[in-house]
Amino acid sequence: MITTRNVTKRFGHVEAVRSVSIDVREGDRYGLLGPNGSGKSTLVRMLLGLVYATSGEILVLGERIPRHASRVLPEIGALIEEPAAYPHLSGRTNLRLLDAAGPNSVRRTRRLRVDEALERVGLAGIDRRPVRTYSLGMRQRLGLASALVRPPRLLILDEPTNGLDPRGIRDIRDLLVSLNESGVTIFLSSHLLPEVSALCTRIGVLDSGQLVLQESLAALQGPTGRVLVSIDDPERAVATLDGQVEHRDGQDLVVRSSDPAALNARLVKAGVRVHALAVQRRSLEEVVLDVTGSGSDQFGVAAAGTAAAPPGAAPPADGAPAVSANDQGTADE
């Protein structure tokens, strides 16, 4: 679906993206993770032909970008940072105008498709209000709706949960999983590690413009070679395991072992009652922080995906049951 080969982008003497090669397969939920300023947005813009690469090759849906972008853009839904909209028009009218401008737009189905897109992102019931009264989170939902008006094969999203509160983030995550299960390939960029971990099946990590990691989430969160064991007789267990115990906390042990079943059998044979046994797995946080050397705050770990409300924000009028309170924001006349 997306392939880049040694893509580099320079702005003057600054390399924003350096020799990046990614591979997004059909059916993926691919998360491009990196701290702010790592080159994520620049790469996303290059995928859509909005920014030209200095060198390298980009293929999207089998076509070279930007040369043949017009062939594939009708099959791509995209949300790039804060979406643009006419502030004096309603969200519904903005979507209708956007759809009408598309080269393959079908007028007779437009109303139904707009209704469905608004419903899916939680804006039904407030879609006739002027966009200038929308909060940041509501504008983000509208931008996602614009990417769904014409059913896409591929969604390319840059920070799609920007401005959303925790409930809004969960709603959008559930929507993206549902779309993916219906056959839509998802590519998104984010600096929020918890959200990428909760949503994506494969990830790439950008650091200072370079791709430092690309792997499936399952492989990254594989076994560590350690087993957590809760037993009734820690002294006998320690003696039985003969140097394999790395840590003891009361009746709980951390044991070096690649074979939990054999470990359990060995303890039982020695007369140690095993209350619980669990394979210790690496967290995505540990892996990403190891390869980037960044602090956890650079990836939204401390905030766990929360988003602050705009300064001075006040909730708009009632009538938006699908949008959570912190997501509704201000009416900026």
List the predicted regions and their residue ranges.
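Short, charged/small-residue-rich alpha-helical element at the C-terminal edge
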Residues: 225-294, 299
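ABC-family P-loop ATPase nucleotide-binding domain
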Residues: 1-8, 294-333
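Short, flexible turn/loop "capping" segments at secondary-structure junctions
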Residues: 52, 220-222, 247
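ABC transporter nucleotide-binding domains
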Residues: 2-4, 9-188, 193-207, 213
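Conserved beta-strand-loop-alpha-helix hinge in the C-terminal portion
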Residues: 210-230
